């Protein structure tokens, strides 16, 4: 039996998200890295007049905490040279978040702060652990940092948001915010949300964006047709929340490759609380690297390739000199 359209009641996503802070200290927005549509949604959210009154701190994955003093000065309005600012996102684990949307996020917060009274200005905390790429020469050097990523992020949230009684918007990749591990043989580790809820149960509301339904996308997406863009809908007690979570994980598999085995009965509702609809999968777009940056800076290009070689799966090629596909999912 196909789902009934009447069982879902999407609400305007921006006001819906802001209203969540009336009942939760934290809203965790899972980010699809490079998504232009999600970045545009975040920009519109930041500009909503009710947002600064509801939120005091934003914690982002796409920033190296080594540069937190630089970011604090920049967000406060101080002039920072581009060469000093760009390492914030470029020196992230891996080869950096150098797509334009990440720099634009920080500049948007800075611009909004200029319009706000001092007491209402937003603070941005850089969620990745502080580390210096010049000290990383082999893959094993990254192991200790990898183990600290979720711990560092969660510790920031506990210290700077929960302890003083503030409200915070958390932005990071989906894996950091999954409420339960999906694999039947999941390791005894804890991601960011699991760490937070262990000590602060009920403090986090998790939102995952729509990226399709794997092999069932063409069958299920028509049931979302007509929704306003952007929309937010609860996953609790709805057919959407009861969908097999494998349909979500299947979105990341190469053609012909089956998604990993999951726990029996594991659903979208086990992973998150709400679902953010930004349009059908085929309409979603990507913020792409600018090849001209790397063609004109051989040292930067070589360094990013070096970092990539230390963290990427075998056979994965980083091509920074060719303009990328503007579609988020080219399939």
Q: What is the meaning of each model-derived region?
A:
Residues 1-331:
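Compositional signal for N-terminal targeting/processing segments
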